[in-house]
């Protein structure tokens, strides 16, 4: 019950900024917007993302709040940041996508026969197929990681989430090895995918989720540093 949730939060804070999953992938955004109409000081923002990529936006918003940014500053920067989150998953098998009606049975059979693996992107709050990789797991994982990190100059290397569904330890270690090879990060977190990702992408899917360098993050980070 969002109204009760917001009411409880407002006993602890003067304003609430609630960041939701992509509005076209979940009912959470619309339900939160409806509940927020009962309050003057609750703002609901569509993150445009799912799973750990939404978490990156929340982490930045929390960082701004802890460093005494205004409500307006947080809202504006969060909306800007949405376009600088890299959020894509590669699918090991299209069976779950077929079951969910996202691809036809014919496409699923073709992908199985040719070892094709769709890459799902989050764009404008929607999940769309943004490309294909080919081959067994080791080949498709290497190709996907190399493609994601092909323009490493524009990647914020502080935090990377390797978000996965139904994957064994050996495969996770292999992905981490590829990350270290192509684009090492200061901190790497292994994170099980949200139900929205897992139910659409199926077991064996994984994504590399991170921020791209952008003026909103750089400017605020510099401004919040204490004077020497």
Regions found by a protein language model. Give the residues of each.
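Short, well-ordered beta-to-alpha junction loops that form the rim of enzyme active sites
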Residues: 21-22
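Glycine-rich oxoanion-binding loops at beta->alpha junctions
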Residues: 1-9
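Mixed-charge interfacial surface used for oligomerization/domain docking
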Residues: 15, 25-43, 49-228
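Glycine/small-residue-rich loop that forms an oxyanion/phosphate-binding "nest" at active or ligand-binding sites
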Residues: 18
